[in-house]
A protein has these predicted regions:
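Strongly charged, low-complexity linkers/loops
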Residues: 124-130, 135-136
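Mixed-charge, glycine-accented linear interaction segment located at domain edges/termini
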Residues: 144-169
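Short beta->alpha junction loops/turns
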Residues: 13, 142-144
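N-terminal strand-loop-strand beta-hairpin
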Residues: 1-122, 160-180
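A short local loop/turn or secondary-structure capping micro-motif enriched for an aromatic residue
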Residues: 76-79, 134-136, 146
Length: 180
């Protein structure tokens, strides 16, 4: 079972977002739109951060389709950065939270975002409008034999390059945004 995720994240402006939407309507396919509420939890018995940057996270995601529990371990030492990701559907957010709280976890933050998801060749990408943060684009390589250059080739059509990638997770971006 493959649980390795290779994706690049870009902070984008409204112009790039509109250009992307116009172009992808010609080249790719809109997979769907959704509203996501992501609640992140931190344990009181282990540090999920190194030097203030998140390297592990537990998240409960609420969508129109249901509730999903996820664990991610970010490998920042790797090039490109990737993470191990494990997800499972849960029937009750409240019960899952009770389990996490009983194990010594507390809520770190809640992130509210609207997402439009697209497919283009071997790529899947999401355009997110994140409350209190702004616009983000995540591009994920779906072919394990694919090369990260496929992502750079795609984003270059919109004036983005390797220098525009943010290696910070959404939790770190949100923390910085809220402290401004």
């Amino acid at each position: 079972m493959k649980n390795k995720e290779i994706e690049l994240k870009f902070i984008i402006n409204e112009d790039i977002k509109n250009k992307l939407i116009n172009e992808i309507n010609k080249l790719g396919k809109l997979v769907g739109e959704s509203h996501l509420i992501d609640t992140y939890y931190i344990p009181n018995f282990k540090d999920f951060e190194i030097n203030g940057e998140t390297i592990e996270c537990i998240r409960i995601r609420e969508t129109e389709k249901g509730v999903v529990l996820a664990y991610k371990k970010i490998h920042k030492e790797a090039k490109p950065i990737y993470c191990d990701e494990f997800e499972t559907i849960v029937s009750s957010k409240e019960q899952m939270e009770n389990i996490l709280f009983s194990l010594g976890f507390s809520v770190q933050m809640i992130i509210d975002k609207s997402r439009a998801s697209y497919k283009y060749n071997n790529l899947e990408f999401d355009l997110d409008s994140v409350k209190n943060l702004g616009e983000l684009m995540e591009v994920e390589l779906k072919n394990e034999n694919g090369k990260i250059e496929e992502i750079y080739s795609f984003v270059s059509k919109f004036g983005l390059s390797q220098k525009d990638v943010t290696y910070e997770g959404i939790q770190n971006l949100m923390k910085k945004s809220l402290t401004k």
